[in-house]
């Protein structure tokens, strides 16, 4: 089975901001079929585009960047994973942000490796 990666929002931001990023180099060595994105990451990136000047240009860049990759939705099955994981974390006194938990839920359901700006 081929490993598939879901890059977190901060990984894509690092990719866009740093032409010499390790993420950019690693993506050049793997098949686009090994990388997926999700609706949560897309929404965070689009929100970032709304916050700054050149909104239309930024949205176009994001859409072009993510076009080669499948985009998984956060759906009802993922919501059930989210609820279970959040409950388990709360019992342990651990809390992570809701968007990160949504991304983690998608990764758990689909057997994906989550990657942040620290590396792919």
Predicted region positions:
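Conserved glycosyltransferase catalytic-site signature
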Residues: 9, 76, 100-101
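A generic structural signal for short hydrophobic patches within well-formed alpha-helices
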Residues: 12-13, 42-45, 79, 120
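Acidic catalytic patch
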Residues: 68-91
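Acidic, metal-binding active-site segment of PIN/NYN-like and related structure-specific nucleases
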Residues: 1-4, 101-120
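Short active-site oxyanion
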Residues: 31-34, 68-70, 108-113
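A general structural signal for well-ordered alpha-helical segments in protein cores
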Residues: 42, 59-62, 79-82, 100
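Short, well-structured N-terminal submotif of metal-dependent ribonuclease cores
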Residues: 1-37, 47-64
């Amino acid at each position: 089975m081929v490993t598939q990666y879901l890059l977190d929002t901060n990984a894509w931001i690092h990719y866009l901001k740093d032409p010499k990023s390790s993420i950019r180099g690693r993506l050049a060595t793997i098949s686009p079929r090994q990388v997926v994105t999700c609706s949560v990451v897309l929404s965070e990136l689009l929100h970032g585009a709304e916050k700054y000047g050149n909104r239309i240009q930024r949205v176009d860049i994001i859409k072009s960047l993510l076009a080669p990759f499948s985009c998984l939705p956060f759906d009802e099955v993922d919501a059930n994973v989210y609820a279970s994981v959040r409950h388990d974390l709360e019992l342990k006194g651990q809390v992570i942000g809701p968007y990160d938990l949504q991304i983690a839920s998608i990764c758990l359901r689909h057997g994906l490796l989550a990657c942040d700006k620290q590396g792919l």
